[in-house]
Amino acid sequence: MGRIGISCLFPASWHFSISPVGCPRILNTNLRQIVVISILAAAVSLLYFSVVIIRSKYGWLSKDKKFQRYLARVTDVEATDTNNPSVNYGIVVDCGSSGSRIFVYCWPRHNGNPHDLLDIRQMRDKNRKPVVMKIKPGISEFATSPEKVSDYISPLLSFAAEHVPRAKHKETPLYILCTAGMRVLPESQQKAILEDLLTDIPVHYDFLFSDSHAEVISGKQEGVYAWIGINFVLGRFEHIEEDDEAVVEVNIPGSESSEAIVRKRTAGVLDMGGVSTQIAYEVPQTVSFASSQQEEVAKNLLAEFNLGCDVHQTEHVYRVYVATFLGFGGNAARQRYEDRLFASTVQKNRLLGKQTGLTPDAPLLDPCLPLDIKDEIQQNGQTLYLQGTGDFDLCRETLQPFMNKTNETQTSLNGVYQPPIHFQNSEFYGFSEFYYCTEDVLRMGGDYNAARFTQAAKDYCATKWSILRERFDRGLYASHADLHRLKYQCFKSAWMFEVFHKGFSFPVTYKNLKTALQVYDKEVQWTLGAILYRTRFLPLRDIRQEVFRAGHAHWRGVSFVYNHYLFSGCFLVVLLSILLYLLRLRRIHRRAPRTGSLWMEEGLPSQKGPGPL
């Protein structure tokens, strides 16, 4: 076997020889194999550096979104860092009928993604308590003395000014939004109250407060804000794909000719207070109307709005139905029921010559009160004596006429228009009386089951009042349940059931109602939805800054990628040069005589083979 001699520029006395026997295997490969090995080496190098780049640039995107939301809820109960200059603040005053409450909210700098909303949370003080304050009476009490309104609301604003860092006052928006109490006032009195606020507040406080920041909002607006707040806390406005999240097809309002989009299913809201009942839910599909009159009514009940900061983007466009029914709250319904009971009994007694309910010994039997309980109704100086029979089914039957249902299609309470609900693909949260009726006494709040609720309500109604009192004294009911709750639990259970199933037409098999007092351990107010909607354009500034930073980051990223590719290219060139050099040596070796040898030794001429014998 021949030898290959390689000469290097080492000291003159250093010479060596290499035999193919001891060389790497690659010297015995053909050209095709060498090319394949080279390509594979280059591909492996490029793949390696691509993985490094992707992991370093996008590794955070692979984190579990559920864990992030859980972490956000945990940090949401921490005290707000008022020393952080990137934290922004906003203030909402809810001027209700019985009093006014101020809520201070805060949020970090927007992340620059135009698809995301502001991460607004309730501000918490050093003791981790929400920054909230309430005063009485309601602002409507100053209808005849509007000049005193600024003094009335001043304690609330001073309270907020103490918690919001002074350096942030001039950029902190203040919204004063008035609800039910102010709605019933004449427009002239409303205007006088608002003008006093707009005139005096800027003199004493540096908050961002313009003419549009003080107004009387409608029941429809209040319902929309409540719907926004609930769904924001539930994370339904985060348009990220998750396997276990329910989705719905949506025809974007104003783009009915376009193809439907698929996004997270939002939750509907049911709220039964003492005076009124309200329902709000998204209407994802384009609706049709039975008549032009119905269409005209629907315009006042459907709200179309864009929560996003870009009016040209449609992913945060929603069509929401909101209807409020005065007189359908739990206490107002009982009052209506008693009024009719009193009037009908007096009329029957007059016609039949009876004395039913006029004495304690001959009480009127009321199926909507617990068994054997005694109660009284007083009107116009007269007293009607009642005794409960605890008949839940009869109570429900008695209450059905109070729904004021009509035979017209797509209607609910009082014959009011109601768009179709996709019961198989929907979810509702029931608040206030929906929760109290299921939890305070029956202890079955949460996931609603009509059959279980009905049976529990029947058992409660049919239980003697003396036993119910004994259970109450032993503390077997919720801590905030009182004797008033125990007395009217039977009535309110039947009323809630009828409103939900007969009034709003939910089937008794419906499984997606959750009765709740809080969402993720937080009491969600409509004021959260109000500030989310009214500050929706604020992210534009941060988005522009993020785009500017992203441009520079892009060039840094390009430079980073370019350097890695340059290194890979240099590595490939060096590898190919070595291989080509070895190939050239091999070809030189093949052209040499097979029996010849190349010797390189110090100070000796090359040896020649012996001549022929």
From Swiss-Prot:
Tell me the name of the encoding gene: Entpd4
Question: Which key words are in the record?
Answer: Calcium, Cytoplasmic vesicle, Disulfide bond, Glycoprotein, Golgi apparatus, Hydrolase, Lysosome, Magnesium, Membrane, Transmembrane, Transmembrane helix
Question: What protein name applies here?
Answer: Ectonucleoside triphosphate diphosphohydrolase 4
Q: Name one GO molecular function term.
A: GDP phosphatase activity
Gene source species: Mus musculus (Mouse)
Enzymatic reactions = a ribonucleoside 5'-triphosphate + H2O = a ribonucleoside 5'-diphosphate + phosphate + H(+); a ribonucleoside 5'-diphosphate + H2O = a ribonucleoside 5'-phosphate + phosphate + H(+); UDP + H2O = UMP + phosphate + H(+); UTP + H2O = UDP + phosphate + H(+)
Q: Which family does it belong to?
A: Belongs to the GDA1/CD39 NTPase family.
What is this protein's tissue specificity according to the annotation? Ubiquitous.
Cytoplasmic compartment ranges equal 1-33, 581-613
